[in-house]
From Swiss-Prot:
<dbReference type="Pfam" id="PF00291">
    <property type="entry name" value="PALP"/>
</dbReference>
<keyword id="KW-0456">Lyase</keyword>
<dbReference type="GO" id="GO:0016836">
    <property type="term" value="F:hydro-lyase activity"/>
</dbReference>
<dbReference type="GO" id="GO:0009097">
    <property type="term" value="P:isoleucine biosynthetic process"/>
</dbReference>
<dbReference type="InterPro" id="IPR000634">
    <property type="entry name" value="Ser/Thr_deHydtase_PyrdxlP-BS"/>
</dbReference>
<comment type="subunit">
    <text>Monomer.</text>
</comment>
<dbReference type="InterPro" id="IPR050147">
    <property type="entry name" value="Ser/Thr_Dehydratase"/>
</dbReference>
<dbReference type="InterPro" id="IPR036052">
    <property type="entry name" value="TrpB-like_PALP_sf"/>
</dbReference>
<dbReference type="InterPro" id="IPR011780">
    <property type="entry name" value="D_Ser_am_lyase"/>
</dbReference>
<dbReference type="GO" id="GO:0036088">
    <property type="term" value="P:D-serine catabolic process"/>
</dbReference>
<dbReference type="GO" id="GO:0008721">
    <property type="term" value="F:D-serine ammonia-lyase activity"/>
</dbReference>
<dbReference type="InterPro" id="IPR001926">
    <property type="entry name" value="TrpB-like_PALP"/>
</dbReference>
<keyword id="KW-0663">Pyridoxal phosphate</keyword>
<comment type="similarity">
    <text>Belongs to the serine/threonine dehydratase family. DsdA subfamily.</text>
</comment>
<feature type="modified residue" description="N6-(pyridoxal phosphate)lysine">
    <location>
        <position position="116"/>
    </location>
</feature>
<protein>
    <recommendedName>
        <fullName>D-serine dehydratase</fullName>
        <ecNumber>4.3.1.18</ecNumber>
    </recommendedName>
</protein>
<dbReference type="GO" id="GO:0030170">
    <property type="term" value="F:pyridoxal phosphate binding"/>
</dbReference>
Length: 440
């Protein structure tokens, strides 16, 4: 306890985290993209290479998953205005939200119904391509739909993939790996929803369940993979490949905005609110957004009050050297996708200069907003996907933050607030009814 007191003396906000209070932290260390980019260790070229790889796989995906055929084998989500929800939030919180609120529906992405369809599927495809190229079975000029042939399935069945997950990452990696022909094992933490485990098993995926949290599931997955030279472990805490799979979203969103005639520039700022677990998904997306929109996009991460691992790590500068359990927080939350006690050190260090801030919200707040969104817009999400929804009113109320960045009333009036909905499109009906019943 003495150590916690010392920590609080140096970092006063820790007291609110320990008390499980909804907390907002505006990052005093935010820099321009030009200053912050070198610390990421990845470049625009890396993201472009990921774009190109996904384009090579498009013919394969269009055939393997017919639901992607209309989009030409591209796994991408809609971005929609949510004016009724914006009004409801203003009414419930008594706070005007300047500008326009939009929802990015990664909750309804093809194949696995969450943001993890970006990174997880991309890393599996990257590994499959690498193996096939090295074996001389494929060239990058081939039509990749050849990967659907029995010969390739046979080849991939000699290899296996392992991952540790609270649910959604396991879902995307499991479904994709099984489709390609890999043997796949998903190590699931105690938070993982039963329906996610059942869905994986229905695809022939081996699910190993733990009574412990996410960190233990990842560690056990890593250990199990080390003993098998043909097993590839997808490391959610450190993977650059996953990160790049998420980063592709930036250019794609820019194209969607261009189609909609939506302007993002110095006088029309873009604020983006991303739910954060270990950090790979929001970190990669935020990196891609920064490359696409430069200093005109402002990214915020959102975490449950019971799992504020990234806020704790970035705010104290301790990154993965501290966990929420170290300050007496239990890491138990209804937002199963965000139930992570120790953040990715890679993501925290890469992105700490490119984030405008982080905030926490209570499980009940997520349930409330889940209900309001269903009532007002007819859109149903899982609890973690609502974490971003609390962002706009926090930003609009934060006059000190607005002054620090020199936002005028006109700029705020022209702003776009994009809430990144991370999952929920595949939640079974009975489970969704339980979620809706918990809202006020």
């Amino acid at each position: 306890m003495e150590n916690i007191q010392k920590l609080i003396a140096r970092y006063p906000l820790v007291e609110d985290l320990v008390a499980l209070k909804e907390t907002t932290w505006f990052n005093p260390g935010t820099t321009s993209l030009a200053q912050g980019l070198p610390y990421v260790g990845l470049t625009e070229q890396d993201v472009n290479a990921a774009h190109d790889r996904l384009a090579r796989f498009a013919p394969y995906l269009a055939k393997a998953f017919p639901q992607t055929a209309a989009a030409g084998g591209m796994i991408e989500s809609d971005v929609v205005a949510i004016p009724a929800m914006q009004k409801r939030l203003e009414k419930e919180y008594g706070q005007t939200i300047d500008g326009e609120m939009l929802l990015k529906k990664d909750s309804h992405l093809a194949i696995s119904g969450s943001i993890k369809a970006r990174g997880g599927i991309y890393e599996v495809l990257t590994h499959a391509e690498k193996l096939a190229l090295e074996a001389g079975l494929l060239t990058t000029d081939d039509d990749y739909s050849v990967l659907l042939s029995p010969e390739f399935k046979q080849f991939f069945s000699q290899h296996s993939i392992a991952v540790g997950s609270t649910g959604n990452l396991g879902l995307s990696i499991g479904i994709m790996s099984a489709c390609i022909g890999f043997k796949v094992t998903v190590h699931m933490s105690a938070d993982a929803r039963a329906w996610k485990k059942a869905k994986l098993r229905s695809h022939g995926v081996t699910v190993v369940e733990y009574e412990d949290d996410y960190g233990v599931a990842v560690e056990q997955g890593r250990k199990a993979a080390q003993s098998d030279p043909n097993c590839f472990f997808i490391d959610d805490e450190n993977s650059r490949t996953l990160f790049l799979g998420y980063a592709v979203a930036g250019q794609r969103l820019k194209a969607q905005f261009a189609q909609q005639g939506r302007v993002v520039d110095a006088s029309h700022p873009l604020f983006v609110y991303l739910p954060c677990g270990v950090g790979g998904g929001p970190g990669g997306v935020a990196f891609g957004l920064k490359l696409a929109f430069g200093d005109n996009v402002h990214c915020f991460f959102a975490e449950p009050t019971h799992s504020p691992c990234m806020l704790l790590g970035v705010y104290t500068g301790l990154h993965d050297a501290i966990s929420v359990q170290d300050i007496g927080i239990d890491n138990l939350t209804a937002a199963d996708g965000l139930a992570v006690g120790r953040a990715s050190g890679f993501v925290g260090r890469a992105m700490e200069r490119l984030l405008d801030g982080l905030y926490t919200l209570d499980d009940q707040t997520m349930y409330d907003m889940l209900g309001w969104l269903a009532q007002e817009e007819g859109i149903r999400l899982e609890p973690s996907a609502l974490a971003g929804m609390a962002g706009p009113q926090r930003i609009c109320a934060a006059t000190e933050y607005q002054q620090r960045h020199g936002f005028s009333q006109t700029q705020l009036g022209n702003a776009t607030h994009l809430v990144w909905a991370t999952g929920g499109g595949m939640v079974p009906e009975d489970e969704m009814e339980q979620y809706l019943a918990k809202g006020r």
